[in-house]
Amino acid sequence: MRHNKAGRRLGRTTSHRIAMFRNMVTSLFAHERITTTDAKAKELRSIAEKMITLGKRGDLHAVRQAASYIRDKKVVTKLFSTIAPRYKERDGGYTRIIKLGIRPGDCAPLSVIELVEEQFEKKVKKSKPTAPAQAVATKPAVEETREAAAAQPQEPEVEISEVKDPAEECEAKAD
């Protein structure tokens, strides 16, 4: 039974899987967006968010922990200097996964995992207009419609008489 065994194995050995995710996290922070399969993106999200949380802490121990996982020292510097301050006010949810479809060769579902960049601003409620300006604006349109209706010639009313079948008319003419 597979109880209490979290995470995906992805068909790799433990050392291969750890090395792959270290490379992917380094690439994600270097480029801020990478394309991969859905399963890898979902696993990578948790690792990347833990690294950003370390970056938000910002102390020496956090720097050393991140440096032990991320392969490039320039990327560690970027994480602590530019990426982590971007999310100071945000509690989690630093990454976004966008599904792309399937890969043509092996039909693997592909996704883009990227760092969320937008800044959330408080929305200002729009107040309803209280001035009767809308009613004044519609009056000329109503008057134009009335004038146009008065200018059109009225069709005379025609009485509809009994409709005769064309076949009967032909027979009547033939007699």
Swiss-Prot record:
GO terms for molecular function: structural constituent of ribosome. It comes from the Bacteria. GO terms for cellular component: cytosolic large ribosomal subunit. Residues 124-175 are annotated as: Disordered. Keywords: Ribonucleoprotein, Ribosomal protein. InterPro entries: Ribosomal_bL17, Ribosomal_bL17_CS, Ribosomal_bL17_sf. Signal peptide: none annotated. Belongs to the bacterial ribosomal protein bL17 family. PANTHER family: LARGE RIBOSOMAL SUBUNIT PROTEIN BL17M, RIBOSOMAL PROTEIN L17. This is Large ribosomal subunit protein bL17. The lineage of its organism: Bacteria, Pseudomonadati, Thermodesulfobacteriota, Desulfuromonadia, Geobacterales.
